[in-house]
Amino acid sequence: MTKRILVPIAPGTEEMEAITIIDTMIRAGFQVTTASAAFDGSLTMKGSRGITLTADCKLVDVADDEFDVIALPGGIGGAEVFRDSVVLVEMVRQHKYEGKLLGAICAAPALVLIHHDLYPDALMTCHPSFQSHIADACWRPKRVTLDVNHNLMTSQGPGTALEFSIELIIALCGKEKAWQVAEPMVTNPTLHYHEMGKRT
């Protein structure tokens, strides 16, 4: 069955992170939905660098849908919108409750996950400028970190977005699929990957 991926976007979303996640997931053959968390319901918005982003639908329209992964791009403005979106926070909470894989990069781990205490004991990374939001016991200074005990993958910023995306593919479908995606992109997965916890 085709994996379903949700990538929320909002005004101020980091464009490189969002587009890299979306593009890489499509290359893997996954069904990708981009959903706007904008408070005014608009589907078209400006990202953190002023680039226009367009969502497939409003987040509320897919709030009850099932996704294999929710992947949260960063960008301070976008992450703040995510933080303040009741719909998104509840979707993440339910996603975690169901034991599904969640990804968050850049500012999103700190401004969304930590702010709402969604993964209080999980090991994670984020953009280094937000390290102070994460408890020392939970902080991992790696470009990509997977806490398998919490099914949570986090990453640091625009420069790590491709590694993050490839590692999401590995977590979903294994390394063979990831290499099928990575090779024509002329990239090498798992260079800076750090997995914590024990697989059950």
Task: Give the predicted meaning of each segment.
Residues K3-T13, T24, A28-A37, D56-K58, ...:
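Active-site-adjacent pocket-lining segments in enzyme domains
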Residues A35-C57:
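N-terminal beta-loop-helix "entrance" segment that forms/cooperates
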